Amino acid sequence: MMNGLVNWAAISELNRPAAKAGPMDTDPAKMWGAVAQMYNKMAQLEREYTQNQLDAMIITEKDTVLDIGCGPGRLSVPVASMAKSVTSLDVAQQMLEKCRENADAAGVSNLTTRLLNWDDVRPGENVEKHDIVIASRTTALADLIKLNALANKYVFILCWTKSPSLKEVHDALFYGVDDTLKPMPPMNRLLGYNVNFNLLYDMGVNPNVKVVTDGFHCDYESREAAYNDLRILHPVPEDREEIFRKNVDKRLTDLPGGGVSFRRETETYVMWWKPGKLEL
C-alpha cells in the first residue's frame, strides 16, 4: 500500500474493535438470525429510499451480482430485476429465508441464496467472481481487498454518512421499553466514509462516491395502526405499552387528509470502484 501522509489502515483498525465486539464474535449466525424479522420490517420501511441507492449503481441486464451480507434481500431483490442474476450471501439462514420469501413475492426467479460466513469466503475457490459485488452495512466493509478480488466490473459499498442509522431509528421507538437500549452518540464524521475512500486511494484505486438521501417511511390510517405495525420490530411488555406509544407519537405527523405518517430521514453513501491489481 502506498505510504500516504496519513496511515488510514491504522485508523481503520483503531475504529473497528468497538464495531466487532459482542455476541457476533462467537456466533454470528445466531445473532443475525435472531433479528431477521426486525431487519425485514426495517427494509420494508426503507423501500422508498432504497431506490436512491439503486439509482446510483451501474448494473446492466448482462451482469452477475454478488450481494454480501444480503439480509432479507433489501438490495438483492430489486437488483435482480436489473441484472442477469444475483447471488445473495448471508451467514444466517433466517435472513436467507426472508430474502427468498421477498424474492418470491416480487416474482424474482434469477436470485440464488448462499449460506456462508464472510470470514470463510475464499475468492475464486468457494465463491466465484461476479461482475458486480455489493456490500452494504456489513462486516465485509472491513476487507476491501477481498471485495476487490470478487468483482470483474465494479465493487459497490454502502453505509451511513450520519445519524440516525437503522439501529438508532429502531432503538428510539423502544427507549424505556427495553432497558438495554440506550441513545448512541451521533456519528463522528472524522471516521466516516473518508476512511475507506482514502484506504482505496492509497491502494491505487480511484473511488467514486455519491451521498444519497435515505430514510424510513410509512403512512397509516390511524395512530393505532402505526402502533400495531411498528410493534413488530421489538417485543413490548404490557406494562411498557404507554412508553412505547409515546415514543412512536414523537415520530408521527398528522396527514392533511387524515391518518398519520412515520418518517425518519438520514443519508447513505454509495462508493464504487473498478477492481484490479492493488498497490499493497
Language model regions located:
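Conserved class I S-adenosyl-L-methionine
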Residues: M1-I58, F156-T180
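Conserved beta-strand/loop positions that form the S-adenosyl-L-methionine
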Residues: I68
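Conserved SAM/SAH-binding loop
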Residues: P72
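Class I SAM-dependent methyltransferase SAM/SAH-binding core
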Residues: L75, S81-N110, R114-D120
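A short, conserved alpha-helix within the catalytic core of class I
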Residues: T139-A151
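Short alpha-helix
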Residues: R189-G204
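Conserved Class I S-adenosyl-L-methionine
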Residues: N208-L280
